[in-house]
């Protein structure tokens, strides 16, 4: 090979290794990031909109928002709990007098 033709020849560069046919890590990263962003969006939507909407819908069905209990302990207005406890202190104890009792 003469020196002038050596300038115009390209150097030998090794080619990339063949792919194994699996999922590329960049695709896995994209899916993970998009899933995380979607989860944050759903949580913020719940905080800002859905929680208030649930309270409004339950209040429209006849319950005030103070009575709302989620789960199996919901308030049943048909069978209220009677107040059967006797008061332990007198109803009108009178004025406080220092040095007595």
Swiss-Prot record:
Keywords associated with the record: Host membrane, Membrane, Transmembrane, Transmembrane helix, Transport, Viral movement protein
Feature: compositional bias, Pro residues: 90-101
GO BP annotations of the record are:
transport of virus in host, cell to cell
Q: How is this protein annotated for GO cellular component?
A: host cell membrane; membrane
Pfam families reported for this sequence: Gemini_mov
**Membrane protein topology class:** Single-pass membrane protein
Ranges for the region named Disordered are 80-101
The cross-references to InterPro entries, in alphabetical order and at most eight, read: Gemini_mov (IPR002621)
Q: Where are the transmembrane segments?
A: 30-50
The primary site where this protein sits is: host cell
Asked if Transmembrane helix is a keyword of the record, the answer is: yes
Q: Where in the cell is it found?
A: Host membrane
Describe the protein's quaternary organization and the partners it interacts with. Answer: Interacts with the capsid protein (CP). Part of a MP-CP-viral DNA complex.
What is this protein's function per UniProt? Involved in the viral transport within, and between cells.
Regarding protein family, the annotation reads: Belongs to the mastrevirus movement protein family.
Q: What is this protein called?
A: Movement protein
Query: Lineage of the source organism?
Result: Viruses, Monodnaviria, Shotokuvirae, Cressdnaviricota, Repensiviricetes
């Amino acid at each position: 090979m003469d020196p002038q033709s050596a300038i115009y020849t390209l150097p030998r560069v090794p080619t990339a290794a063949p792919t194994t046919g699996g999922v590329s890590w960049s695709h896995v990263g994209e899916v993970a990031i998009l899933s995380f962003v979607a989860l944050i969006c759903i949580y913020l939507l719940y905080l800002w909109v859905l929680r208030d909407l649930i309270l409004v819908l339950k209040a429209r069905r006849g319950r005030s928002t103070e009575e709302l209990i989620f789960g199996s302990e919901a308030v049943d207005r048909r069978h209220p709990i009677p107040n059967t406890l006797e008061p332990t202190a007198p109803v009108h104890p009178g004025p406080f007098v220092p040095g007595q009792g």
